[in-house]
A protein has these predicted regions:
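Mature catalytic domains of secreted/periplasmic carbohydrate-active enzymes
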Residues: 1-286, 295
Length: 295
């Protein structure tokens, strides 16, 4: 044992303790939102980690989860700063990701614009390819992406936001099978490009290469998602190499077939001691990221 140390994320000393009247009003308003709108997600940004809020958080969670059970719905509460006891809600990382796979479900929340959560002048919009790569990386590590879109004052969505969302939707139309209802594999991926761990890092450019892959799985299918297309259509997945189990490789099974999502053409493939080698008919010359999934 050792002397206790102050939590660096404890804001009680600078924020002041809320009154019981305030917290009771907060709880009633939260329950009113739950009853009136049946939300799928209850998202709390910050401040609720206050010590005075803890008993009210328990009541809010109990009310929400019980009401969801009555509705027959699966719901989630998102939180930061250890506001909820681990395992009772979903931990959230603002504008950042995990560097490695996690045994528990987690979430990233970020916005299409790097410099604002709202629609403002001179928004720095992120390319759709960057957001798609983040989505794939997050899912491969047992996470989910909550993407914010800031509407204009009249409630409409800007052309720039619409273009990004449409591009993401087009990609999901082809590759959604590798995202929806999948689970993590033995490792999240491979490749030379590292992802920074923790929040407020989505502004750090990730220069993915054709050697960067992320893995997801569903049933007896493994999805290997390339985070950047190779112009020659060739891909080499080293995690699927043929080696004895004593060599430390992550996969010792058979590869029965290989296919590419979005096309009926069967790619040529071989497998040896260095990896699974795939030759596709899909060639891309554009420098922008074009993400494909192979299973």
């Amino acid at each position: 044992y050792w002397p206790s140390m102050p939590d660096p994320e404890n804001f009680d000393a600078i924020d002041g303790k809320p009154s019981e009247e305030f917290m009771a009003d907060w709880l009633v308003r939260t329950c009113e939102l739950i009853d009136n709108y049946h939300p799928k997600i209850l998202y709390f940004d910050w401040w609720i980690q206050q010590e005075a809020a803890k008993p009210y958080l328990k009541k809010a969670a109990a009310y929400y989860y019980n009401r969801a059970a009555e509705w027959g719905e699966e719901v989630a509460i998102d939180y930061k700063f250890d506001a909820y006891m681990f395992g009772t809600a979903v931990p959230d990382i603002e504008r950042g990701q995990m560097a490695d796979i996690k045994p528990y479900f987690w979430q990233t929340d970020t916005a299409i614009a790097l410099n604002s959560w709202c629609y403002t002048e001179n928004n720095d919009f992120r390319p759709a390819g960057d957001i798609i790569c983040d989505l794939v990386d997050i899912v491969s590590k047992n996470g989910a992406l909550l993407l914010n879109v800031g509407p204009k004052a009249d409630g409409t969505i800007s052309d720039e936001d619409t273009a990004v969302l449409t591009a993401i939707g087009d990609w999901m139309q082809v590759n959604g099978e590798a995202i929806y209802d999948t689970h993590v594999w033995r490792t999240f991926g491979e490749g030379p490009t590292k992802v920074q761990d923790g929040g407020f890092s989505d502004g750090v450019k990730k220069n993915f290469t054709g050697e960067d892959f992320r893995f997801t799985a569903k049933g007896d299918t493994l999805f290997a998602i390339a985070l950047k297309a190779n112009d020659n259509g060739e891909y080499h997945v080293h995690s699927l190499r043929m080696q004895e189990h004593t060599a430390g490789t992550v996969y010792h099974g058979l590869v029965e077939s290989v296919s590419v999502l979005g096309t009926d053409d069967a790619p040529a493939w071989t497998r040896d001691e260095s990896g699974l080698h795939i030759k596709t008919c899909l060639l891309y010359t554009s420098p922008s990221p074009r993400d494909g999934a192979t299973s």
